């Protein structure tokens, strides 16, 4: 019961960290591709 009520508290920081990480990785890969070609 407590896990269901605590899910938003776990997901909010997780999403806040995962989305910028994915954005940085995709951006760095895009920059590397542009530098190579």
UniProtKB/Swiss-Prot annotation:
Topology term for the membrane: Single-pass membrane protein
Keyword list, A-Z: Chloroplast, Membrane, Photosynthesis, Photosystem I, Plastid, Thylakoid, Transmembrane, Transmembrane helix
Cellular location(s): Plastid, Chloroplast thylakoid membrane
GO biological process per UniProt: photosynthesis
A single GO cellular-component term on record: chloroplast thylakoid membrane
Keyword Nucleus found: no
Coiled-coil intervals, chain numbering: none
InterPro entries, alphabetized: PSI_PsaI, PSI_PsaI_sf
Family assignment from sequence similarity: Belongs to the PsaI family.
Function: May help in the organization of the PsaL subunit.
Protein name: Photosystem I reaction center subunit VIII
Organism, as annotated: Morus indica
């Amino acid at each position: 019961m407590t896990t269901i009520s605590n899910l938003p508290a776990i997901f909010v920081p997780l999403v806040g960290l995962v989305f910028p990480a994915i954005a940085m990785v995709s951006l760095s890969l895009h920059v590397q591709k542009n530098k190579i070609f």
